[in-house]
UniProtKB/Swiss-Prot annotation:
Cofactor-binding details, from the entry: Binds 2 [4Fe-4S] clusters per subunit. One cluster is coordinated with 3 cysteines and an exchangeable S-adenosyl-L-methionine.
EC numbers: 2.8.1.8
Family stated for the protein in its record: Belongs to the radical SAM superfamily. Lipoyl synthase family.
CC cofactor: [4Fe-4S] cluster
Pfam annotation, one family: Radical_SAM
Record-given protein name: Lipoyl synthase
Protein keywords: 4Fe-4S, Cytoplasm, Iron, Iron-sulfur, Metal-binding, S-adenosyl-L-methionine, Transferase
Binding site for [4Fe-4S] cluster 1: 55, 60, 66, 292
Primary location class: cytoplasm
Gene3D superfamilies linked to this entry: Aldolase class I (3.20.20.70)
Cited NCBIfam families: lipA, PRK05481.1, PRK12928.1
Length: 335
């Protein structure tokens, strides 16, 4: 394989990746869809009004559960990223012009879908002086203004570590301030060549220093060891991270990083317990967990553990019960 599906010549790393066949998934990664009335209503609304969510467009396997709980994720800044991470299937290249009306459009989508909690994530926009910080901040403000009873979680790139850019997002006061570390120091540059491990930790620390509830994610199965995961968890907690999600890497296609291992549900349970012992206030770990999975539930859990009262206008966001994709729930189903 020397040509990418879109017709361009493969990068050397892509050609090397393509030499490794796509891996067969283990039995525990099979997902059973359960469509409830809330999901059916949201799906009908989204189709009827031409609304776009990452949940549908990325084919997320957890869409049924999240939509049933009136939670969804939106991607802003366009569909092209200025950086290439070896696990991510978002297109890399020169992005188009910023749509200054996008914050309003996203806020209207949140309103039309009747969401209780919205996660907003952004492509990296290194072509912009502020890295897209204004767009992220304005989207938070627009959602809150139009949907006062909706919680907002913002998942940002690192804005090249520019404190002023990060501060713009913090000042918009999202319920959760998130930046994903994704992997461990030893393989970080191989997996995320345009990012820096310490810089990512610094972004999280800035959020914590300004009173944010801070969240991050680690993807397992890209070449790390369990000991390295534990060390990264300690680094994240030391940086001020309150909430952590642990996920299994699923290879999007042959030109992406090969899967190094399938992490068993039992290992996710052990790592989840380790994260709680380290001091994380909210932990979600499992093979099919994704960073925005049951995000509102994790926020509510962290708020209660911090001793913060959940505001009246967000009191409908609950942290009770288990989540289907948590490793412990998965093991219970597997028997």
């Amino acid at each position: 394989m020397t040509i990418a599906p879109e017709g361009r010549k493969l990068l050397r790393v892509e050609a090397r990746n393509a030499e490794v066949p796509i891996e067969k998934k283990p039995s525990w990664l099979k997902n059973t869809a359960k469509m409830g009335p809330q999901f059916t209503e949201l799906k009908s609304m989204a189709r009827g009004r031409g609304l776009h969510t990452v949940c549908e467009e990325a084919g997320c396997p957890n869409i049924y559960e999240c939509w049933e709980d009136r939670e969804a994720t939106f991607l802003i800044g366009g569909d092209t990223c200025t950086r290439r991470c070896d696990f991510c299937d978002i297109a890399t290249g020169k992005p188009g012009m910023v749509d200054v009306a996008e914050p309003r459009k996203v806020a209207e989508s949140v309103r039309d879908l009747g969401l209780r909690y919205a996660t907003v994530t952004s492509v990296a926009r290194d072509d912009l002086a502020d890295g897209g910080a204004w767009l992220n901040a304005e989207t938070i403000r627009a959602i809150h203004a139009m949907n006062p009873s909706t919680g907002v979680e913002i998942l940002i790139p690192d804005f090249k570590g520019q404190p002023d850019a990060v501060q713009q997002v913090i000042d918009a006061q999202p319920e959760v301030f998130a930046h994903n570390l994704e992997t461990v120091p030893r393989i970080f540059k191989q997996i995320r060549p345009a990012f820096a491990y310490e810089r990512s930790l610094d972004v999280l620390t800035q959020g914590k220093e300004h009173g944010m509830i801070v969240k991050s994610n680690l993807i397992l199965g890209m070449g790390e060891t369990d000991d390295e995961v534990y060390e990264a968890l300690c680094d994240l907690h030391d940086a001020g991270c309150d909430i952590i999600t642990l996920t299994q890497y699923l290879r999007p296609g042959p030109t992406f990083h090969p899967i190094d291992r399938w992490v068993k549900p039992e290992t996710f349970v052990e790592l989840s317990k380790a994260a709680e012992e380290i001091g994380f206030l909210g932990v979600m770990a499992g093979p099919m967990v994704r960073s925005s999975y049951r995000a509102g539930k994790l926020w509510a859990r962290a708020m209660k553990k911090m001793g913060r009262e959940i505001p009246e206008h967000l009191s409908h966001i609950d942290d009770s019960g288990s989540a289907t994709q948590e490793a412990s729930s998965l093991l219970a189903r597997l028997g």
